Amino acid sequence: MADRNVLGGELEPCGDDPVTGFYRDGCCNTGPEDLGSHTVCAVMTAEFLGHQRGIGNDLSSPVPAYQFPGLVPGDRWCVTAANWLRAHHDGVAAPVVLASTHERALDVVPLAALQEHAVDVPANPGALED
């Protein structure tokens, strides 16, 4: 069975430049090894990156040992649900691609919070509630 996104559809890729995902497969897939739940497909902003650095999660600096290139504003990256939620509470949440955000993110983050920051909302949002 295919992984599902927070809207109930098939999980879409998040990013391939740089290649994201806990499994470095371009998707915000998760599994038992992913203890941090890297399930939110976020579009990096300077504010979000600065916030993450401030809480001890430096996403800007490369870490070659983990195939991590370091991120810049505009990059799409699978971030942990807890860190995204913390940024949301602190007023600096990164925009979210709902179709690429794994349904397991909902174990931590309310759907309404994700929708508030969605960048892939269709012209008719009512169509999401079929």
Region roles according to the model:
Residues 60-67:
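Short alpha-helix capping/helix-loop boundary micro-motifs
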Residues 102-130:
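Glycine- and charge-enriched low-complexity intrinsically disordered segments
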Residues 43-58:
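Short, basic/aromatic beta-hairpin or loop at an interaction surface
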Residues 84-107:
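Short, compositionally biased
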Residues 1-47, 120:
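Extended boundary segments
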